[in-house]
């Protein structure tokens, strides 16, 4: 999977092979962000299995602040000191843990501050129900309490319903919900805080949320002067049609940063390695070039099949210098609007099945997905070695990437930090961790990891990366007959629908990737026809097609 690339001015700094390509050298320090100064306060209850859940949500919000050139500070709520928020333009409180006791100093400052305060989900009762703070009179609305499922789901009634449908800009954003009747486990976040507006001169409902089963509608996002209330935690169970996009858009208003309406689209040809079909690449290149659509190519510099899965049991390595098909495809595509994104070094790990075949393009490179842990060698230095090796392989064959994309969008924290030292721009989704060496075993204070999609450019994320968004996903077919790992379905219509939702973000991108092997006869799929339909559908929505290097 791949993302977008940087403008020429922020591409990799040129280094000579004779200097051994000192690509691990850190970039020059950037100027301090010019955006609003923001504070993110999160729940961090002691000795709970969910102690660090608030932190991972805080990291996700901090990443979004990177779109606004704001290098947000993170603070556990128990460490809050009176007067702290007055040094910030905006304070966000993430109420992820029900009943977490909040410091009186924090509650008092929220009550009296004239700076922007945005409160998410839980624990508003500690402010709204304490007469000392005169909350209803000050805010113009009252807090009634929390609501969850309409009833407990059962095998006979697996979908009893909840407040799951957020209405915004003519779209219905439906929250994720899956109930496993065998285990009784609910995969959802149904709880919301219910408020009632008492004084419309003081409080305004910005976004409603409805409960289709009961017919009720209540406020989802409410504003009272400098105070905003978001009824749930929009960082849980996110997706390309989720209420997370509503928050991403409204952050402009919450922060007072008014980006112009702008909608750009990007397409990336994915997992292009030594055994790519030259004909498939030429077909896609000619189509995009004919449409005057720039594109990027996620290139795997070195091919490895250590177990001989596709070579009659004999291990096979193909360096780029010997990858005739790949170089032919690249040399045809680059003069016709293509740009290279470096997609890992080998896009696989060691001689292990991680988890599929051990073959380049199939497996994870910077994460042990089988053990769900960092790889044994994990360190910034180890990751830098692989990044440098991949760049050297490209450079020695005359190629320069405009961005980086992590294989399967999943790398360790230390590997992501290494990427930020080498590449000025990445084009991807990212997994974030609450520790560099996370421990996920069920226990008090266990670590959390969370993947994040971005609808727009993030100038600096938690690991220091600049990120161009891949926000729509990709066409998928059930091709298990030729690849046992590929049996999901995601149609071109799904991608175009995702693009329609992405337009609700005022500067949201429509960015997706496509596997050229879907044009090969063995795939037994209408890949090329569907690719054209997808391009036409996104174009019809009014997006402007751009190359990664054109994004400022």
Regions found by a protein language model. Name each.
Residues 264-274, 278, 381-384, 388-403, ...:
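Catalytic grooves of carbohydrate-active enzymes
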Residues 39, 124-131, 294-412, 509-518, ...:
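Metal-dependent polysaccharide deacetylase catalytic core of the NodB/CE4 family, i.e.
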Residues 13-88, 261, 288-290, 297:
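Aromatic-Pro/Gly-enriched surface loop or interdomain linker
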Residues 71-74, 251-261, 279, 283-305, ...:
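C-terminal domain-boundary segment and adjacent tail
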Residues 155-225:
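Catalytic beta-strand/loop cores that center a nucleophilic Ser/Cys/Thr
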Residues 97-179:
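A glycine-rich, often tryptophan-bearing local segment used as a flexible ligand/cofactor-contacting loop or short
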Residues 48-127, 279-282, 307:
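Helical hinge/lid and interdomain linker segments adjacent to catalytic or ligand-binding clefts
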Residues 184, 374-457:
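Catalytic domains of cell-wall/extracellular-matrix polysaccharide-remodeling enzymes
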